[in-house]
UniProtKB/Swiss-Prot annotation:
Keywords: Repeat, Secreted, Signal. Its main location: secreted. Belongs to the cysteine-rich repeat secretory protein family. InterPro entries: CRR_secretory_protein, GNK2, GNK2_sf. GO terms for cellular component: extracellular region. It comes from Arabidopsis thaliana. It is found in: Secreted. This is Putative cysteine-rich repeat secretory protein 13.
């Protein structure tokens, strides 16, 4: 009897650990509901088109963790209020089945948090999902930026921290903004030692941006948040629909 109880307790602890791990690795981060694009009702043509686009994406391989999809071909210009555009960009280490999983989590979260909105964006740790009635492909969405910072400040060797961080950022900026091809997915990661610590960092752009657009987007983040956050905090992440950046004094990516 006691052995059965121990086995049940062990299984419960294992399930708790698995669920906790999943929550940490793909936690909800933020959402934005766009009220300017109007709303749709349950069972409407817009909702049917949206569901169909999501189903279509579900059948894609998502080898590079990205798609920009619509229910119309060539993203034609139209005043049809039922056209749907969907962007899915998964984090560079979350592709294939991991990206599919994040898609379904994000779509469910978006429908709950922005119920009936034709335009909305939601961020999870492993992906960003945007639905829209307007074609946003290739645009830098400056209105979508937000930041999350580590509560701990840099307490010592501040000048060394700043210099090392800037060198690493420069390296990753160049890596993420090479010509996009099968060998480069607008995603760069790296690390550098700062005294006894290591800094881990990543930069990524949505693959609908051009190489120049990616550079402009990441440069905008660095310029806007540089002195106030990056030189003071032990870790910060800045996210948007178009590009993202993160650094921490602990590893946060999949190996």
């Amino acid at each position: 009897m006691s052995s059965n109880i121990l086995a049940m307790v062990a299984m419960q602890l294992l399930l708790i650990r698995i669920v906790s791990s999943q929550n940490v690795t793909n936690e909800y981060l933020n959402h934005q509901c766009n009220n300017t694009q109007g709303t749709y009702t349950r069972g409407s043509t817009f909702e049917k088109n949206l569901n169909q686009v999501i189903r279509n994406i579900s059948h894609l391989h998502l080898r590079y963790g990205y798609t920009y999809n619509s229910n119309v071909e060539a993203y034609e210009v139209s005043k049809d209020p039922n056209i749907v555009f969907v962007l899915l960009q998964c984090r560079g280490d979350s592709y294939g089945s991991k990206c599919h999983s994040c898609l379904h989590t994000a779509f469910s979260g978006l429908r709950e948090r922005c119920r009936g909105n034709k335009g909305a964006i939601i961020w999870y740790d492993q992906c960003v999902l945007e639905i829209s009635s307007v074609n946003t492909k290739g645009r830098i969405r400056y209105d979508s930026f937000f930041n999350m910072t580590n509560v701990k400040n840099v307490s010592s060797n501040a000048e060394q921290f700043k210099n090392k961080r800037k060198d690493l950022f420069h390296k990753l900026l160049l890596g993420a903004t090479k010509d996009v091809s099968d060998s480069n997915d607008a995603y760069a990661v790296g690390e550098t030692r700062i005294g006894r610590n290591k800094m881990y960092a990543m930069m990524q752009c949505a693959l609908d941006l051009t190489t120049n657009g990616c550079y402009v987007c990441l440069e905008w983040i660095i310029g806007r948040y540089d002195s106030f956050y990056f030189d003071r905090r032990q870790g910060t992440r800045v996210l948007s629909r178009s590009c993202s950046l993160r650094y921490e004094l602990y590893p946060f990516l999949r190996r």
